[in-house]
């Protein structure tokens, strides 16, 4: 079909045209050596069986779609939440292009980071010269206020010593001696993106706060969001603390960086936590982490080196937000204002409106440990019944915490927690023990296609939908958003399953 410049056909419609369908069929028949359709269908059906599930869960040396990213992604994300900070990755350009692209495709925003451009020679002899030259170019060309260094597999395998390399770069005159260059070793072959976040956060805080301890507290509360990719959450946190009159510092605030306005002029480093505020965080009254499993090393460092009180509070749903606000009130002496109590009432009222559609519904969820705990806890409040909980980057500590939450609810008795399993395992679970809906990131759309189970997109990354990252998921307002996504996904599916005229449309109701 010839294209008309007045109406260009996009790929969705273009590849449905007869010439393309014929092309694809000939390609399969003459060049791919494909199995007959009947055999493909037979094997496909077998992969949905209990027999295949047992074989699937017995595999040891293969991972299929792991539902996690590698350490440098988390390290870059943590660094970009600080004012004027340029992530510098000691490794190859291809790896850094992946990290940047992964974040850019989620946020639909540019993501600035540089690479030391290590190639074959650096893989053998080390990347010292790459760093010396890269530091000079980065400092002079991009004019950052801080450069945060992390590593890829190549640099870790050869054993690059970041601390020594940075010192040599300063001695060589690439950057000033007093210029802040925190670093973190982030090997991609261990841990995940949440490990990289923790390593970089500890590296940045230890660098900026060195020698800044004072005899008296500044009276502030530090908040560490963790690997939380919803920019609306930091804004909601700031709004709630503003309403309470709490003096605070968010350690790594990337909300303006990944949701910057289009004002007609390019700004390379929008927003971020002020470096002087981060440096003074050592003198705060307490530090509250909103995620536990993205901050273990950072919290241990703050507790032992800063001698500062640390807490983990997850302000999700009614109960979680209640506990968070109560704890902040006790730490600061500030009362919880009526405005937030009214918001709580709105969430309770909304739950009452939608409760009947969620209560008793079985669901499955995969994602990062803290996200799973927060979302599952909120859904348990509404009587939803988890069946499959899968966390590839979860550990035994997470499993015990999650199982304790499930055991404390009458709706969590049938759930099973799977750690260090991937999305191909999740597929077997959905086929052998179906649920009413499942929750996950964009990679779950292939499971939605295979199983026809309704999917609620919550998590990271969200590549195939726009603007979801702008919403909040924490606090009472965030609870409304989660409730909205879940209940309306269920109602959409109800309409789809009752839309056949004269057969199922007796329940195709106008009012739900």
From Swiss-Prot:
<dbReference type="GO" id="GO:0046872">
    <property type="term" value="F:metal ion binding"/>
</dbReference>
<comment type="function">
    <text>This molybdenum-iron protein is part of the nitrogenase complex that catalyzes the key enzymatic reactions in nitrogen fixation.</text>
</comment>
<comment type="similarity">
    <text>Belongs to the NifD/NifK/NifE/NifN family.</text>
</comment>
<dbReference type="GO" id="GO:0016612">
    <property type="term" value="C:molybdenum-iron nitrogenase complex"/>
</dbReference>
<dbReference type="InterPro" id="IPR005976">
    <property type="entry name" value="Nase_Mo-Fe_CF_bsu"/>
</dbReference>
<keyword id="KW-0067">ATP-binding</keyword>
<dbReference type="Pfam" id="PF00148">
    <property type="entry name" value="Oxidored_nitro"/>
</dbReference>
<feature type="binding site">
    <location>
        <position position="95"/>
    </location>
    <ligand>
        <name>[8Fe-7S] cluster</name>
    </ligand>
</feature>
<comment type="subunit">
    <text>Tetramer of two alpha and two beta chains. Forms complex with the iron protein (nitrogenase component 2).</text>
</comment>
<dbReference type="Pfam" id="PF11844">
    <property type="entry name" value="DUF3364"/>
</dbReference>
<protein>
    <recommendedName>
        <fullName>Nitrogenase molybdenum-iron protein beta chain</fullName>
        <ecNumber>1.18.6.1</ecNumber>
    </recommendedName>
</protein>
<feature type="binding site">
    <location>
        <position position="153"/>
    </location>
    <ligand>
        <name>[8Fe-7S] cluster</name>
    </ligand>
</feature>
<feature type="binding site">
    <location>
        <position position="70"/>
    </location>
    <ligand>
        <name>[8Fe-7S] cluster</name>
    </ligand>
</feature>
<keyword id="KW-0479">Metal-binding</keyword>
<keyword id="KW-0408">Iron</keyword>
<dbReference type="GO" id="GO:0005524">
    <property type="term" value="F:ATP binding"/>
</dbReference>
<dbReference type="InterPro" id="IPR050152">
    <property type="entry name" value="ChlB/BchB/BchZ"/>
</dbReference>
<keyword id="KW-0547">Nucleotide-binding</keyword>
<dbReference type="GO" id="GO:0051536">
    <property type="term" value="F:iron-sulfur cluster binding"/>
</dbReference>
<dbReference type="GO" id="GO:0009399">
    <property type="term" value="P:nitrogen fixation"/>
</dbReference>
<dbReference type="InterPro" id="IPR000318">
    <property type="entry name" value="Nase_comp1_CS"/>
</dbReference>
<dbReference type="InterPro" id="IPR024564">
    <property type="entry name" value="Nase_Mo-Fe_CF_bsu_N"/>
</dbReference>
<feature type="binding site">
    <location>
        <position position="188"/>
    </location>
    <ligand>
        <name>[8Fe-7S] cluster</name>
    </ligand>
</feature>
<dbReference type="InterPro" id="IPR000510">
    <property type="entry name" value="Nase/OxRdtase_comp1"/>
</dbReference>
<keyword id="KW-0560">Oxidoreductase</keyword>
<dbReference type="GO" id="GO:0016163">
    <property type="term" value="F:nitrogenase activity"/>
</dbReference>
<keyword id="KW-0411">Iron-sulfur</keyword>
<keyword id="KW-0535">Nitrogen fixation</keyword>
């Amino acid at each position: 079909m010839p294209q008309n410049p007045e109406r260009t056909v996009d790929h969705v419609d273009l590849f449905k045209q007869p010439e393309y369908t014929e092309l694809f069929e000939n390609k399969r028949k003459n060049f791919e050596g494909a199995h007959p359709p009947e055999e493909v269908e037979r094997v496909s059906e077998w992969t949905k069986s209990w027999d295949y599930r047992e074989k699937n869960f017995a595999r040891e040396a293969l991972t299929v779609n792991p539902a996690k990213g590698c350490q440098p992604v988390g390290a870059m994300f943590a660094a970009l939440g600080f004012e004027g900070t340029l992530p510098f990755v000691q490794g190859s350009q291809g790896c850094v292009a992946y990290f940047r692209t992964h974040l850019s495709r989620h946020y639909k925003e540019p993501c600035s980071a540089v690479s030391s451009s290590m190639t074959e020679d650096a893989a053998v002899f080390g990347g010292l010269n790459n760093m010396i030259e890269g530091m000079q170019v980065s400092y002079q060309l991009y004019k950052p206020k801080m450069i945060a260094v992390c590593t890829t597999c190549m640099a870790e395998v050869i054993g690059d010593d970041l601390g020594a390399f940075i010192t040599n770069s300063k001695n060589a005159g690439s950057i000033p001696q007093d210029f802040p260059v925190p670093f973190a070793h982030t090997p991609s072959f261990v841990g995940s993106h949440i490990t990289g976040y923790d390593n970089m956060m500890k590296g940045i805080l230890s660098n900026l706060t060195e020698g800044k301890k004072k005899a008296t507290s500044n009276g502030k509360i530090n908040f560490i969001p963790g690997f939380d990719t919803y920019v609306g959450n930091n804004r909601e946190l700031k709004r709630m603390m503003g309403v309470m009159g709490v003096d605070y510092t968010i350690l790594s605030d990337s909300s303006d960086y990944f949701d910057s306005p289009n004002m007609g002029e390019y700004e390379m480093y929008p927003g971020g936590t002020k470096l002087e505020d981060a440096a003074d965080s050592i003198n705060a009254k307490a530090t509250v982490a909103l995620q536990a499993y993205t901050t273990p090393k950072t919290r241990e460092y703050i507790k032992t080196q800063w001698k500062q009180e640390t807490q983990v509070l997850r302000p999700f749903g009614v109960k979680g937000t209640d506990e968070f606000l109560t704890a902040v009130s006790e730490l600061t002496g500030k009362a919880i204002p009526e405005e937030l109590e009214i918001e709580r009432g709105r969430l309770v009222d909304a739950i009452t409106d939608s409760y009947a559609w969620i209560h008793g519904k079985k669901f499955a969820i995969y994602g990062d440990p803290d996200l799973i705990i927060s979302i599952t806890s909120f859904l348990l409040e509404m009587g939803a019944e988890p069946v499959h909980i899968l966390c590839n980057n979860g550990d035994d500590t997470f499993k015990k915490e999650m199982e304790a939450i499930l055991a404390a609810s009458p709706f969590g008795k049938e759930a099973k927690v799977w750690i260090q399993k991937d999305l191909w395992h999740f597929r077997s679970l959905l086929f052998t023990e179906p649920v009413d809906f499942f929750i996950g990131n964009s990679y779950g759309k292939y499971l939605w296609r295979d199983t026809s189970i309704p999917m609620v997109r919550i998590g990271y990354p969200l590549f195939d939908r726009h603007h979801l990252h702008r919403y909040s998921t924490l606090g009472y307002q965030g609870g409304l958003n989660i409730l909205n996504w879940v209940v309306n996904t269920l109602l959409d599916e109800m309409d789809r399953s009752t839309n056949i005229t004269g057969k199922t449309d007796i329940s195709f109701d106008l009012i739900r």
